[in-house]
């Protein structure tokens, strides 16, 4: 029997940047170090196939030149890694703007999307990026969004529709990562509503992160949309199955990019990053997710269905871990082992 070799297994480079580098936070971990950790991880002869990337300093500038991108491509190639999905820095502190702001915010948001799509296209043309999307969100918080939820959702949808036009010009696709900290995306209901309003399923999809979507079940920033009751008993597997199936059946048709992750049912913020679903280590005993089982709800056509094979790669996401954890080789071997288990259970062979 052939061993599954798809989806390809990627690590994320941005945990070296997210929640780090600001006053009171730990220092950044440079890109070379993150790529070395990724390339050196190995479990029974299996290694990571590639990495996903945040298009922002200190890893790679959103204003990178072609020579900068050639150097990036060389960094990947010499480690036998491909590049997959990339994150456009659409937020105000990184040169972007709020998608609900019809003025400068929208202009800056779209400018960063354009730069991100151009980089993604260039890396694709260089032959180091065979698949992947450009990751975005709404770059505004729930509190601002809730000042006028109906009007703001309309404005956000208009901004994202324009972003789709830009992406198509570069032959790229966008995916919005559902997190409780983004206005218009703070619950599974608002997320689907936004995707339906934009109505560009060939260009704008959903990026499902297992840690962040778990918080959708709990309704952390939208109690009216919670799928698990307050004080939920995590030992009640049947109730969790029912809620998780409802969530994934709703969002899976829109999902074009997938993050394997663990969460302990709490939120966490670090440095400049707002509170969002807490990423936990792959083998954290407090993790609420049976990662392999729950990944199947995203990677198959419903519970027990056939693998749908729509994601050419899947990526581990574990942000805001202490640097001591990040620089421990066992961390990455544990992560890779979990990713292999997911692929063996729900992948395919080509």
Residue ranges and their predicted role:
Residues 36, 241-247, 285-308:
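A short, acidic, amphipathic alpha-helical segment used as a generic capping/interface helix at domain edges
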Residues 1-130, 151, 161, 168, ...:
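N-terminal pre-domain/capping segments
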Residues 274-276, 280-291, 315-350:
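Aromatic-rich peripheral "rim/lid" segments of glycoside hydrolase catalytic domains that contact
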Residues 151, 157-277:
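Acidic/histidine-rich catalytic cores of soluble enzymes
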Residues 119-149, 170-181, 315-316:
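Active-site groove signature of glycoside hydrolases
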Residues 25-30, 53-68, 92-98, 141-146, ...:
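Acidic-and-aromatic substrate-binding clefts and catalytic sites of carbohydrate-active enzymes
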Residues 5-12, 49-53, 83-88, 132-136, ...:
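Hydrophobic faces of well-ordered beta-strands that scaffold small-molecule active sites
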Residues 15-29, 59-64, 145-151, 219-236, ...:
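Short, flexible/disordered intra-domain loops and linkers
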């Amino acid at each position: 029997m052939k061993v599954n070799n798809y989806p390809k297994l990627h690590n994320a480079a941005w945990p070296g940047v997210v929640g780090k580098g600001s006053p009171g936070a730990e220092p950044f971990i440079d890109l070379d170090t993150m790529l070395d950790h990724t390339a050196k991880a190995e479990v029974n002869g299996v290694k990571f196939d590639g990495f996903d990337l945040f298009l922002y300093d200190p890893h790679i500038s959103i204003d990178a030149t072609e020579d900068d991108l050639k150097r990036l491509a060389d960094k990947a190639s010499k480690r036998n890694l491909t590049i997959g999905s990339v994150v456009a820095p659409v937020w105000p502190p990184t040169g972007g703007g709020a998608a609900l702001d019809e003025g400068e915010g929208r202009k800056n948001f779209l400018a960063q999307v354009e730069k991100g799509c151009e980089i993604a296209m260039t890396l694709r043309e260089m032959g180091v990026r065979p698949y992947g999307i450009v990751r975005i969100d709404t770059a505004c918080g729930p509190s601002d969004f809730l000042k006028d939820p109906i009007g703001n959702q309309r404005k956000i949808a208009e901004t994202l529709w324009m972003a789709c036009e830009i992406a198509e010009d570069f032959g790229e696709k966008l995916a919005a990562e559902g997190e409780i900290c983004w206005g218009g995306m703070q619950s599974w209901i608002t997320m689907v509503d936004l995707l339906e309003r934009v109505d560009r399923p060939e260009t704008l999809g959903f990026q499902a992160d297992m840690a962040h979507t778990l918080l959708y079940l709990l309704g952390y920033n939208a109690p009216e949309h919670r799928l698990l009751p307050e004080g939920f008993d995590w030992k009640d597997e049947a109730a969790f199955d029912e809620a998780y199936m409802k969530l994934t059946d709703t969002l899976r048709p829109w999902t074009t990019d997938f993050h394997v992750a663990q969460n302990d049912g709490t939120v966490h913020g670090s440095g400049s990053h707002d509170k969002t679903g807490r990423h936990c280590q792959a083998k954290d005993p407090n993790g609420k997710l049976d990662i392999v089982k729950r990944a199947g709800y995203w990677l198959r056509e419903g519970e027990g269905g056939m693998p749908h094979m729509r994601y050419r790669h899947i990526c581990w996401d574990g942000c805001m871990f202490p640097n001591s954890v990040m620089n421990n080789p066992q961390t990455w071997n544990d992560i890779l082992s979990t990713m292999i288990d997911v692929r063996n259970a729900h992948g395919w062979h080509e």
